[in-house]
Amino acid sequence: MAAAVGRDTLPEHWSYGVCRDGRVFFINDQLRCTTWLHPRTGEPVNSGHMIRSDLPRGWEEGFTEEGASFFIDHNQQTTTFRHPVTGQFSSENSEYVLREEPHPHMSKPERNQRPSSMVSETSTAGTTSTLEAKPGPKIVKSSSKVHSFGKRDQAIRRNLNVPVVVRGWLHKQDSSGMRLWKRRWFVLADYCLFYYKDSREEAVLGSIPLPSYVISPVAPEDRISRKYSFKAVHTGMRALIYSTTTAGSQMEHSGMRTYYFSADTLEDMNAWVRAMNQAAQVLSRSSLRRDVDKVERQAMPQANHTDACQECGHVGPGHSRDCPRRGYEDSYGFNRREQEEERFRAQRDPLEGRRDRSKARSPYLPAEEDALFVDLPGGPRGQQAQPQRAEKNGVPPYGLGEQNGTNGYQRTAPPRANPEKHSQRKTGLAQAEHWTKAQKGDGRSLPLDQTLPRQGPSQPLSFPENYQSLPKSTRHLSGSSSPPPRNLPSDYKYAQDRASHLKMSSEERRAHRDGTVWQLYEWQQRQQFRHGSPTAPIGAGSPEFTEQGRSRSLLEVPRSISVPPSPSDIPPPGPPRPFPPRRPHTPAERVTVKPPEQRRSVDISLGGSPRKARGHAAKNSSHVDRRSMPSMGYMTHTVSAPSLHGKSADDTYLQLKKDLEYLDLKMTGRDLLKDRSLKPMKIAESDIDVKLSIFCEQDRILQDLEDKIRALKENKDQLESVLEVLHRQTEQYRDQPQHLEKITCQQRLLQEDLVHIRAELCRESTEMENAWNEYLKLEKDVEQLKQTLQEQHRRAFFFQEKSQIQKDLWRIEDVMAGLSANKENYRVLVGSVKNPERKTVPLFPHPSVPSLSPTESKPALQPSPPTSPVRTPLEVRLFPQLQTYVPYRPHPPQLRKVMSPLQSPTKAKPQAEDEAPPRPPLPELYSPEDQPPAVPPLPREATIIRHTSVRGLKRQSDERKRDREQGQCVNGDLKVELRSYVSEPELASLSGDVPQPSLSLVGSESRYQTLPGRGLSGSTSRLQQSSTIAPYVTLRRGLNAENSSATFSRPKSALERLYSGDHQRGKMSAEEQLERMKRHQKALVRERKRTLSQGEKTGLLSARYLSQPLPGDLGSVC
């Protein structure tokens, strides 16, 4: 499968045919014989076997059904297991038992052993002839084996010497099972589509020979819902041309299934469809020709060689082997022409009626259809253009064989009167119809058996049935009339154009290498130069040929030099026009030039407005590639497929192509402006839409602010981390002035940036807070609106009104649900600005009796004289014992969140539900003669301590006992003495001194620490000024008596005693203190024993207590 096939490369009286499985064979019409070898190159073309570089000319390597390798000599039509050069067996056959015949010639008795449509198997009798001595073990494959065609070891071996047209990723649907889509790496080369597991292209997973396939987008009946999907449908040559009869419907072999592919983008899909159609149409629009002595049979319907044989796919060197039911004379269908003529006459009337009834528009241009039908001497339009038989006119038409033998003719234009257009036309129309159904759902599209819809005269139509020859290059006389304008893909065989391509500079090639078309173009040129230009025309270099090419270039509308038209490239058809009958003496491939008024469609782009032509094309095509319609002045040449024909582009065409692309841009803008609707548009239907839109806009504003704040915070954190490193370096290099100066300079710059970022962050935070307030307001409005709508919905009486209100409610719900995801993020961000988590706890000394500032203190309150502190101040808050208590909540030992000094005390709102009430004031003095009060038992919450495990409780008890004996702190806490008493000095100062320090401590001006662990912390509350006497809890630091040496001129208040270093203990003896402490410790031990006995019920008790009020006596809490 190496040599390229071209009609002009074949000698006279030679043509080629294609089997159903894509294999190509060549027909000598003069000798009535077939061969797998190209008559000029001597190499097989797509025969299903491998061509190796170490094999002589005409030799190929094949494989048996068992996998053994053998060699095929197409010259002698023999097979052998020995290498023709070395004479040795292949190393791959070491596991096989080979039996070589003395003269293994392809014999007729073994012709039925090979199944049809198996490209990967032998097309000759290689396997069967080598095993003739022992035919018993020979396994005859059934038709079910056909379904494994092209996979794994059955795949065609890829020739790495052939350039790759396209490669890339595609999704392919499995042929069986669950029909999953799998991603595969596809490579299009040598008219075959290979696919691999990945881009390394190591092992071929399968191969698909594209000739005789039709590639098109998926249709609705395919039931493929995947985007950008297309398919490769195998249809035999006769099925493309003649699909109405039973024989035609049987042409599609069961082994040739439909392949479904899916690309990632629309551009990729279009590129793959074009490239695969190029490879598929190389061999699918071919037909076989007859020579001069059978010219009278030219107008008769004849099918392909493969159709006359029921085995079809194997007309070749082993032709007689594959067709046992026929003799040599009827192997090509000549003896059946009389029967076919009768069948053709019987088919004329129904086909004619069907043509008259079809009113659907053809996807081809009228000029293109002219080229399709007028050029076919034996095809349907050939009969239509020539209603009477040539014999009736007295002069038989010229046969193709006669024209091929006429040396006076030179090719000056692509042949338009070739029977091979039947197949290509049917392929293109079927492709266009599938595309039209899928894209537009056009109900006027005809089924596949009516894929030639066109309004025309009621002339007889015929479909060739049994023999389709591929004519060689035909030539027009210099004085012959030119065919009408057309865009039909045909051959491109002009020495002038190829020479002008050689003049292209590398810059020009690079400048226009912008798509798949130009990639195919460059690939064709590389292959052409690499393989020695196998597609050179016969009349190349002839002066007459050059003149004819130039003269035709002035009369024809150019077509793209790249690819045949795809469904998206097909312009709309023009009005119907009758075809004039051919003149009696007009050769088969001469066509009549039509009057100027009948030539239109593609002429519009030249004589008329380009915008008008663009508008026509846009009606029936979603995308029209202007590269497929170059301007006037360039010959109408198309490339039938890659690697077969060279093509070129001169400087004039390149310049005109640029102009057309420029005009396309201008026309696109005008068309868009023209097509714009002038009807006004309403965005909002009701006030609900407006409110929801504003609400969503506010959410977007918050999102933007959140992103800005997030970015600023990241920058701030980075700068702070760098500055922290610089601070450490400053301390480290303190004794190095030079280095320290550099660090200081860098530090100063970063500090300026930090200040700027912090200012920006503060501004954005303020804006975020304002936006959040607006957001909450809008949310409240929307909620009220929702409630109103719900109320209206309940009251609504009419169904239409209820339906409209329900729609509005759904809109509100959808918007609220969509915005709820970001709401919590905004709340946390704004809350972190208002109430930061960590508040500063100062470590510097604080006045023992802090006071309010003059602006914040009440006029009646007087500041107390401060005293020097000796330790960190403790938070002390006043709270009447008779007031309502908040349930106690245990907290681990931690610093209390205090308010910043910058905040006003008026902003400090009490939060009774979050904090415990403040402690009442401490007493000043009491009489030692007084009976000490009885210590009440600990409340239930005393069981909730830091350590909840049994081991931790026991260890805590031991530590407290040891600390008590040593006079140390209990668990790191100072000893706390609790006493309930009536303090006259304190009561006297309720209206004066006492509330002031309490307020100053409670307010935001003071910085303080909490009592660690078990202290009851509460929200700010003012001591209610009352003349009643109420008991209070005394909180005293347990200090030794010997430390109390300082004396006071007046009694100290509770706060002064707390923050002063010396307390007077003269009123209580040491024995009384020890006795009191013992009672207290005994109560603690009893409670802990009770906790140890309860075990894991502690959590339940604490949960139960949280729902109960605090006991009346707080004196047991330490």
Swiss-Prot record:
GO terms for biological process: cell-cell adhesion mediated by cadherin; epithelial cell-cell adhesion; pore complex assembly; vasodilation; zonula adherens maintenance. PROSITE patterns: PH_DOMAIN, WW_DOMAIN_1, WW_DOMAIN_2. Residues 114-131, 452-481 have a biased composition (Polar residues). Residues 564-579, 930-939 have a biased composition (Pro residues). Expressed in kidney and lung (at protein level). Residues 8-41, 53-86 form the WW domain. Residues 697-798, 1064-1091 form a coiled coil. The modification Phosphoserine is found at S533, S542, S566, S601, S605, S609, S857, S864, S868, S900, S904, S983. It holds the Pfam family PH. Residues 163-281 form the PH domain. GO terms for cellular component: cell-cell junction; centrosome; cytosol; nucleoplasm; pore complex; zonula adherens. It comes from the Eukaryota. The keyword Ribonucleoprotein does not apply. The modification Phosphothreonine is found at T867. Residues 100-113, 334-355, 434-443, 494-512, 586-602, 955-966 have a biased composition (Basic and acidic residues). Required for zonula adherens biogenesis and maintenance. Acts via its interaction with CAMSAP3, which anchors microtubules at their minus-ends to zonula adherens, leading to the recruitment of KIFC3 kinesin to the junctional site. Mediates docking of ADAM10 to zonula adherens through a PDZD11-dependent interaction with the ADAM10-binding protein TSPAN33. Interacts with CAMSAP3 and CTNND1. Interacts (via WW domains) with TSPAN33 (via cytoplasmic domain) and with PDZD11; the interaction with TSPAN33 is dependent on PDZD11 being bound to PLEKHA7 and facilitates the docking of ADAM10 to zonula adherens through interaction of TSPAN33 with ADAM10. This is Pleckstrin homology domain-containing family A member 7. The lineage of its organism: Eukaryota, Metazoa, Chordata, Craniata, Vertebrata. The gene is Plekha7.
